[in-house]
A protein has these predicted regions:
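Short, low-complexity, intrinsically disordered N-terminal peptides in bacterial proteins
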Residues: 1-7
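Catalytic core of Fe(II)/2-oxoglutarate
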Residues: 215-284
């Protein structure tokens, strides 16, 4: 079982805040091995095996307690982060402008000595597949497992550097941002407080691609999970999600997250457009 518990501290359990009720897709049980089959981007939607079921949960507004959140306790935070990017659909501008911005953000928030930005995913809630982008993920999950976390380091770094880095602390953090000039109204992202996740609450899910197989954690339903979100995120905000931490000293090692339908959204909400950037943060 993964070791995910955070240390109990005076600020480890934030007070509960106003909430909405929404359905999120969990694994109901482990009667069927979870597997997700991913076609190339723009060619179709993923197909998944597993006994998934929608469960209604209370998702609390995290804005009133944003300053109390920590990557080492809850495993997600909200950061104020203005960007100079004009067009997030321009891959050259992403590489030239946004990657250095994200690298600086991760260093600022974690104190990491080196940050590697290695992947971007644009998600569009309105006809995302037709436009060659992915739709928001409606599944309670975490992007890495105990196995795939270290493997990502080996995949991305030269062999000698990878093995040296694996001997020290490293963290995998996703940076999630609204790329529209309007606040998010459709399919916001919800997060589970890491401290409310028990080891039995996650299952390994195989990710099948045309050229490789990976794995992530899928959430198994637990009524004790504490859910949060940041309503109406703007273009100058970024959510940081810790997806893997090599340290096993009591700090939070990862969280769970999923898109959901916010019942307070307008009747005809503006389609969500977002970018999720994956990073590796290394510490000396």
């Amino acid at each position: 079982m993964p070791d995910i518990r955070a240390a109990e501290t005076t600020n480890a359990r934030p007070v509960l805040t106003p909430w909405v009720e929404a359905a999120v897709p969990y694994l109901a049980d482990l009667s069927v091995k979870p597997v997700t089959y991913n076609p190339p981007v723009g060619t179709g939607t993923p197909r998944r095996d597993g006994n998934y079921r929608d469960f209604k949960v209370r998702i609390h507004d995290a804005r009133p307690i944003a300053r109390d959140l920590s990557l080492d306790h809850q495993a997600f935070i909200l950061a104020q982060h203005a960007t100079a990017v004009r067009d997030f659909y321009d891959h050259d501008e992403i590489r030239r402008t946004y990657e250095p911005e994200v690298e600086a953000l991760i260093k600022r928030e974690t104190g990491a000595s080196k940050v590697v930005v290695f992947d971007h995913t644009i998600r569009a809630a309105d006809r995302g597949v037709e436009r060659g982008h992915r739709a928001p993920v409606r599944s309670v999950h975490n992007d890495y497992t105990e196995k795939s976390g270290p493997q990502r380091v080996r995949d991305l770094l030269p062999p000698d550097e990878a093995e040296a880095r694996l001997k020290k602390r490293f963290v995998e953090i996703n940076v999630w941002r609204n790329v529209s000039h309007d606040p998010v109204e459709m399919a916001p992202l919800g997060f589970v407080d890491s401290q409310s996740i028990a080891p039995r609450d996650v299952a390994v899910c195989d990710l099948i691609y045309a050229d490789r197989t990976g794995e992530i954690y899928i959430g198994v339903y637990n009524a004790d999970h504490r859910w949060y979100y940041f309503p109406k995120m703007t273009r100058d905000e970024a959510a940081l999600i810790k997806c893997y931490d090599s340290m096993k000293d009591g700090r939070a090692r990862f969280s769970l997250h999923s898109a959901f339908d916010d019942p307070t959204s307008p009747k005809n909400p503006k389609p969500r457009e977002s970018i999720e950037t994956r990073t590796l943060a290394f510490f000396d």
